[in-house]
A protein has these predicted regions:
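Membrane-interface extramembranous regions
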Residues: 1-139
Length: 139
């Protein structure tokens, strides 16, 4: 099971590295569509900042899967929290019928919403973040 968790952490890390990099380049305009208009920050700043956070978390997931294993749970919890914090962007895209990333119908945008909870769960499970949260709850 430890091998499967490590492989999934590596895959999630690679996914975040790729997504974060695309925030800064090829898909920047697409990501702008997800920034809620009620957010009191410059949308371009939000896209760049979230991209840098994704790159950082992706790298840390990979590093903690391979070598700094004692920090895996902490990085997993932080990644899960990040996924929760960016969820309003996905909701914004759905509610306001915004086309981006090929999500050009409400059905596609709704299906995309369904992927966020499993991403949160994956971040917690593959990093042993759930175990860390259980330990913290006992304190």
């Amino acid at each position: 099971m430890a091998l499967i968790k490590s492989l999934l952490a590596l895959l999630l890390g690679a996914f975040l590295l790729s997504a974060g990099t695309s925030h800064l380049g090829s898909n920047r305009t697409e990501f702008l569509a997800q920034v809620p208009t009620w957010l009191p920050l410059d949308p371009d700043f939000v896209v760049i900042a979230s991209g840098l956070v994704e790159i950082t978390l992706g790298a840390l997931l990979i590093i903690t899967a391979l070598i700094l294993k004692k920090y895996r749970g902490v990085i997993g919890v932080i990644t899960a929290v990040f996924f929760i914090l960016i969820f309003p962007g996905n909701i914004n895209q759905y509610v306001n019928h915004l086309d981006a990333f090929g999500l050009d119908t409400d059905t596609k945008r709704f299906i995309r919403l369904l992927f966020q909870p499993p991403l949160v769960a994956l971040a917690l499970w593959c990093s042993d973040g759930l175990s860390l949260l259980k330990k913290l709850k006992q304190i």
